[in-house]
Amino acid sequence: MANQTIIPEIEANHESMTAWRRDIHANPELGFEEYRTSAMVAEKLKSWGLEVHQGLGKTGVIGTLRVGNDTRSIGLRADMDALPMAENNTFSHKSTNPNVMHACGHDGHTTMLLGAAKYLAESKNFEGCVHFIFQPGEEGVGGAKAMVEDGLFDQFPCDSVYGMHNRPGMAIGKFGMRSGAAMACLLYTSPSPRDVEE
């Protein structure tokens, strides 16, 4: 990883963040059943002084951090749910829930957003408002829709929202961005791919 740097305060939290991810990985929960995960997220956000709202979109969590008088606001979003599949790994933090597994990286996504929230809450090196959006039910059960219908952007208006998802195959230290909608689709109404609109 030549010429790459990690913010020292984030690097200092590496062990804690690894423990968070492993805990979430070992205790996966399906969409709209993320009770343990959302409670863990809310507890950590509160401990860092964020304003926390739970239950949006059933099990979603919003942490709000305001710094200074700037009225601009952004949303940073990560998903929390796991997939209905058995985990065959043998490491110590493998799934303890039969036939439920974090196979899509949402344990990492949740951890990364928690790490960002902790860093920004401690450093306060910006002006404005950040809404940390922890989304339930991303895996095909309509978690984003449920949050929006519960008033996500009415209660927590954002000038822009940045959603994040890991992408195997992308070089370490790189990230991709696009303007406009991303990572969105309609709920599947048919098993036929030709019936799914993107």
Where are these regions (language model features)?
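Single conserved hydrophobic/aromatic residue that forms the stacking wall/gate
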Residues: 188-198
